[in-house]
Amino acid sequence: MTSLSIQPFPEISRMARDLDSRKKRRISLDGIAALCEHSKEIIDSLPMLNSPDYFLKPCINELVEREIESPDYCSRVPDFTIGRIGYGYIRFLGNTDVRRLDLDHIVKFHRHEVIVYDDESSKPVVGEGLNKAAEVTLVVNIPDLTWGKQQVNHIAYKLKQSTERQGATFISFDPDNGLWKFFVPHFSRFGLSDDEAEDIAMDDAPGLGDPVGLDGKKVADIDEEDQMETSELELSHSLPAHLGLDPEKMKEMRMLMFPNEDEDESEDFREQTSHLMTSLTKRNVRPSQKIAQRNSHQDPPPVVRKTPLALLEYNPGNDKSSPGSILMVQQNKNLAVRKSKTGGFELDISHVTPLTDNYSRNVVDAALFMGRSFRAGWGPNGVLFHTGKPICSSSSQMVLSSVINKEKIAIDKVVWDRKGKVQKELIDSAFEAPLSLHKELNHVEEEVRFGSFSLKLQNVVTDRVVLSDICRSYIGIIEKQLEVAGLSTSAKLFLMHQVMVWELIKVLFSERQSTERLMYAASDNEEDVMQDVKEDSAKIDTEALPLIRRAEFSCWLQESVSHRVQEDVSDLNGSSYLEHLFFLLTGRELDSAVELAISKGDVRLACLLSQAGGSTVNRNDILQQLHLWRRNGLDFNFIEKERIKLYELLAGNIHDALQDFTIDWKRFLGLLMWHHLPPDSSLPIIFRSYQLLLNQAKAPWPVPIYIDEGPADGFVSDNKHSDILYYLMLLHSKEEEEFGFLQTMFSAFSSTDDPLDYHMIWHHRGILEAVGAFTSDDLHTLDMGFVAQLLSQGLCHWAIYVVLHIPFREDHPYLHVTVIREILFQYCETWSSMESQRQFIKDLGIPSEWMHEALAVYYNYHGDFVKALDQFIECANWQRAHSIFMTSVAHSLFLSANHSEIWRIATSMDDRKSEIENWDLGAGIYMSFYLLKSSLQEDADTMVELEPLDSTNESCRNFVGRLNESLAVWGDRLPVEARVAYSKMAEEICDLLLSDLSKNPSRETQLTCFETAFDAPLPEDVRSTHLQDAVSLFSLYLSETGQISA
């Protein structure tokens, strides 16, 4: 590694140029004593710094001057800075109390790192002393400042990673002078570990190679690695710690059992110290030379590796056996025997992080942020494993890190009963029944091609005439769900709210059948229904349709608030019948209000109540009467306040009438429609008027049902949510306009306190889109949320059905492919074990190749290679099928004599052999074997003219050559059994070849056949047998040759 000397950069030099003394930093203040009678107090309040190569800003002289000018200045020094020449500096942000700080022991700069408060026991709490936010600048010693931009960017990236891993914030890296700048919230130790320094090609020399002083001369590096304060290993890195033992106890036992050994070590320690201190007096000594000098006397202690700890608030004093860290590293501790703690890691309440108005002890969140090193992670189906406190636990008791908690996201809460158990009936009524109804509706299919495959994306189509029947069908399903035993109160509340939503959809978006539609429907049975058609068509008045819809909405609103009216009335206990009347009017229960007024003898008020919400003339008359009373100075103290409020309400002044009352948003909307706006106002005008008052903060917010009618059982976001009923009203009033509230409208919080429940909202969205209320392709959160719910209950087929209804987008063309394939692969065991689901998925038009591929991966994972092979063949993954056939299937079938199955599988891939790598050296080997074996057996059994032995031998030689080449190509991928199968094939072929050598009397040809056998991968015993036969044949050949020669 190239050595480098960096000249003192201007920033640090400028900070250090005020230093008058380079050897002693605690200056004499005799001259200053005359300036102030409290000189002794000032001297005692100053920080102490004796290290020759450290500097301060403001310097000691400036601190004295400012302390004289402004008493207690040292308790509030702005932007206090301390640094070491050639190593870096720290600028503490804000005002810092530096009184009586022993800076020599508190701040230590080393090569590529800085340590503040080495001793954890003396470190103050965060925010006090020097344990506060600061900006750190370290000098990074890179080997060559002339590197290119790519290398510099690599170093900057490594530094940024190291900074963020230690809980600090990376600011900048200046390659011109090697300055690494970052922000820290508090202190222990920050810098680069040994491994990180090696990764970014740091220089091996300690410090800055040879740090440069202010006078241009090199300063000796007095680092902690060269001082004997680190001569002994930390207990956390000792052998007992790696063996799972308590190093403190082992140290204590060693001291008790071998006291003399400690004295010997102390003697060695002193000798080693003397030797090393002598070596430190030599300047510009290479690191290798220093090590050589140490080794000349005694081997140095091994290098201590510092591994990161994951938690920022970790106190190393709590667990002596934990490894050190670059994040909150355990520093060198005294080796005095201490009593070790037997418990696990605990997070002290004093070290928690304040969040808004409370404290967080979310070890789980910290674990998920820091990663696997903190032993936390997600499993399938929303399972979380961690070592922190249970998520919903309210206990203040600390937890041990050795306790692993398993928790699961309640994505299936909608099918729980009051005891928190899943009920099959709820699964059917919440998921399967609504989806079955959705599937029965008319659909249009859009075929979209993805390469060689295609999907049939679906969309529901319907019209507003049949919307009423669809809504009634959904309501019937919900009513059956309400009959399930064991439902919690909150579950019943949400189900009733779903009924209200479907009723409102029917009121706002359905249409009555026109005359033309009735005539078309009657054409098939004209004689029977023509009279009914005429009667129905006579009743339809197009101009009256808005008023009919308004009346239906009024009835819906009366029904939805009736229970709130009864609750308010029951709270009165008959104390005031006027308040009773007022509450009845908020729900438009005019009949009951009139009867109550009559029963109390208030006949005139009953007459006014009977006309409430009617003609605006009556309202104006009451309003004029109230104005007349006020103008004439009527003393309203003689009239009940409740009666005045009734008059105000009847006059249309709903805000004056509601001064002392708090009502829900639906009743306020009703008062606006019934008593304030004209009786012929259309619904869009009513909804917009309410929205205008809402924007002016003059109307109650349309809060969701779980806030409006009681505390929610689950998690409730702090954001201001609105009820889906309100969004339906906005959607009706803005059908011809642009609207941007769909994301919020179809969020889970618009109808339930469960942020993961989308099971009914998805149907709302689908039906509203089908009738043309809106069109959107940006509601993927809704779709995927519902998919996750279905998958949590094992309803994979319905999950795929929902995916097919996601609108196609050009910017995400492969969204459907990705999601469907992920479902098939991840939940293969579920859908493949149920024939009904498998058939349902096929009927949806999902490519069978995807299903076979998922099954192949599943069977391969579980070691069922025969089934995996069949599935890979079915999905036309020929290369993968061929690989499994050769490495896992073929040899087992061959050794079990299942030759017909081998032939079937091999021939099924033979047509695609051009797509398969090494086919001739793979499955082609088996096919060649059977063909060659069959040919040799036919030659031996038939009486026809035999094939010449030369030709047969050549065929066998080619086969043997391919066997050997196949073994070389497949190598270690072939198990021992496959090699046995190869030996069996070679043995059978060689036996057939050598079984009848008499068909060719030529001894040379016969010996050539033996050469073929010797090249084959035969077992040694078989090879020995053939060798004996070959020797016999060769002897015979020699004898025959001798006879001929004689």
Swiss-Prot record:
UniProt cross-references to InterPro entries, sorted A to Z: Nucleoporin_S59-like, Nup98_auto-Pept-S59_dom, Nup98_auto-Pept-S59_dom_sf, Nup98_C
Protein keywords: Membrane, mRNA transport, Nuclear pore complex, Nucleus, Phosphoprotein, Plant defense, Protein transport, Stress response, Translocation, Transport
SUPFAM superfamilies xref list: C-terminal autoproteolytic domain of nucleoporin nup98
Tissue specificity remark: Expressed in roots, leaves, stems, flowers and siliques.
Coiled-coil residue windows: none
Region of interest (Disordered), ranges: 283-304
Residues modified as Phosphoserine: S523
Disruption phenotype: Pleiotropic phenotype with diverse growth defects and early flowering.
Bilayer topology: Peripheral membrane protein
Cellular compartments per GO CC: nuclear envelope; nuclear membrane; nuclear pore; nucleus
Domain Peptidase S59 residue range list: 51-187
GO biological process, one term: innate immune response-activating signaling pathway
Protein name: Nuclear pore complex protein NUP96
Organism: Arabidopsis thaliana
